[in-house]
Amino acid sequence: MSQWWKEAVVYQIYPRSFYDSNGDGFGDLQGVIQKLDYIKRLGADVIWLCPVFDSPQDDNGYDISDYRSIYEKFGTNDDMFQLIDEVHKRGMKIIMDLVVNHSSDEHAWFAESRKSKDNPYRDYYFWKDPKADGSEPNNWGAIFSGPAWSAMSTAQYYLHYFSKKQPDLNWENEAVRREVYDLMTFWMDRGVDGWRMDVIGSISKFVDFPDYETDDSRPYVVGRYHSNGPRLHEFIQEMNREVLSRYDCMTVGEAGGSDVEEAKKYTDPSRHELNMIFTFEHMDIDTKQHSPNGKWQMKPFDPIALKKTMTRWQTALMNVGWNTLYFENHDQPRVISAGAMTRELRKQSRQSISNSSARHEGNPFIYQGEEIGMTNSEMPLEMYDDLEIKNAYRELVIENKTMTEEDFRKAVAKKGRDHARTPMQWDDGKYAGFTDGEAWLAVNPRYQEINVKESLADEDSIFYYYQKLIGLRKQNKVIVYGDYRLLLEEDPRIFAYIREYRGEKLLVP
């Protein structure tokens, strides 16, 4: 198979917030089709489409109830097939989100599984007896707050690493793995060019379900047992043999709990697993992830720590695996915070951030709106829609009282996922040109000064800076394939490095 994906620039679309074609306030597939020429103009080669499958939308589509049907608000299967065709007509490719660590609790598999202990689908999920006192089988926590176990009428608990409406699939069951490979084949046979695999690092469980040892008062813990289970790489290698190896495709795994040594296992071509993974390490520089308050416990940003972290990933995977290059996506806030930053400072900030990674080795991932400098939004707590924020508020502020409401509000203003999910700002009209109806989530109030129309009219805009960076990458193999060496390691003001490839050197100041 070719390695076309190494030279690709990826544009991520969060479809419910991208463009609404029918005025119902909810982005859709026809809206994506209408904006493909804009993405092509930027210079992207691949579109990553966040989940559009049928779903109750408890977690905005990351809770799938039917993997072969499109959610009605997004459109139909025919709309999806048309989108695939239109992307290919423009010389681009499209990858979809594969969410198979868990399904929705409204999936037919779970509807059967919950009926009785002897149901044929029972082992599609993890069911365990309670402890002697009737409590959860262990002290594992859910990433979206609370316990990772919920009880059902069959007197057992089922496992869910995220929301209770997202029960974890049992990858130990060969029938489950076959279901996954079949659904992947269904879409790849219809032209999908690859997958971004949601929390793929969690599909293998520690099936003895040990309790975490903890020295604090937390009743539930999220930690090392939540990822990198004993059969993880066995499962991914099997997926590669059964499906991926039959297609000339791009594969990206979300593996937030992985260090560089684990990343080598995923991405070393000789192991036949994935092309690359997303790591979160560089995104957690300003948070105390392992504190009782998790990502909401802020700490001062350390630019030297960022440089060292990114350099460690560059050098560890050099000539072994491959990196992803990103600072924004649907799970991360905007890099540029809301506030009084002037237009010129915003532009300089965005250019500096893109310079620090876009010329590293790996695939650049651009999240919708990043290319025009969209910022974090400004909204009161009650206006946030995200399940993660609502659950964390209840747990940390109301129940555990480990954060004050004001401290939590400040943390959400910096780290909330909804900042990335506000509607795409196309122009300075009502609802930023996203919809003719009422948008499903409040539009960022800065849309009148930050929008696509304004960006395209300004030849010195962030959009055109990104376009030039992409063009440079396409014209210079040293940016794609060159070795990496950091300069001025201890200087907090300068992130400079050298790339070198076949006698050519590039200094990035």
UniProtKB/Swiss-Prot annotation:
Subcellular location: Cytoplasm
Site (Transition state stabilizer): D331
Enzyme class: hydrolase
GO cellular component terms given for this protein: cytoplasm
E.C. designation(s): 3.2.1.10
One of the GO biological process terms: oligosaccharide catabolic process
Protein origin, superkingdom: Bacteria
Catalytic activity: Hydrolysis of (1->6)-alpha-D-glucosidic linkages in some oligosaccharides produced from starch and glycogen by alpha-amylase, and in isomaltose
NCBIfam families the record matches: PRK10933.1 (NF008183)
Family, similarity comment: Belongs to the glycosyl hydrolase 13 family.
Protein name according to UniProt: Oligo-1,6-glucosidase
Lineage: Bacteria, Bacillati, Bacillota, Bacilli, Bacillales
Gene this chain is encoded by: malL
